[in-house]
């Protein structure tokens, strides 16, 4: 099984990258949390890898941190959650926010993630609550967690997109088209902004 790849970033997109390792190009699926930390194409890159083996395909999923990889592996261990949905969950929620939602049973926030209904959210909490506590990512709170301020989210997304090479004026225009909700996360708004910028 491939657990780590180090090489040069040959191509990147919000859904997958191609990593050149000694002349061999590996297609690696990634969450947005990994995408917006990538170097420019041609830059050096090392990714933690989860290898998914099926009868008809072998897919690689890459993460910048071991923590994200462990979260991904916990998610796909839940009945009804496959690699694609797990990647989507990580794309729409930061690790600490996801852990908080699971530990505190925040079904509303979990259900707001695309692809997750109430039943799946309940199953995630039931199966992962104690495991999240052991990872030490969450900060249990009696009243649940407080969503990041809307302006703080916009500022973080603006900074991330500028680092990706987009001009500030173009990003500001894209952000003006978005409606940031109370339960929004940086990853979710980033994903929405990228859709607008890539039209």
Swiss-Prot record:
Domain III: annotated span: 149-199
Region called Domain I, residue ranges: 1-64
Any one GO molecular function term: four-way junction DNA binding
SUPFAM superfamilies in alphabetical order: DNA helicase RuvA subunit, C-terminal domain, Nucleic acid-binding proteins, RuvA domain 2-like
User: Does the record's keyword annotation contain Oxidoreductase?
Assistant: no
UniProt region (Flexible linker), positions on chain: 144-148
**Gene Ontology biological-process entries:** DNA recombination; DNA repair
What information about domains appears in the record's comments?
Has three domains with a flexible linker between the domains II and III and assumes an 'L' shape. Domain III is highly mobile and contacts RuvB.
Question: What exactly does this protein do?
Answer: The RuvA-RuvB-RuvC complex processes Holliday junction (HJ) DNA during genetic recombination and DNA repair, while the RuvA-RuvB complex plays an important role in the rescue of blocked DNA replication forks via replication fork reversal (RFR). RuvA specifically binds to HJ cruciform DNA, conferring on it an open structure. The RuvB hexamer acts as an ATP-dependent pump, pulling dsDNA into and through the RuvAB complex. HJ branch migration allows RuvC to scan DNA until it finds its consensus sequence, where it cleaves and resolves the cruciform DNA.
Q: Could you identify this protein by its name?
A: Holliday junction branch migration complex subunit RuvA
Organism listed in the record: Citrifermentans bemidjiense (strain ATCC BAA-1014 / DSM 16622 / JCM 12645 / Bem) (Geobacter bemidjiensis)
* Gene designation per UniProt: ruvA
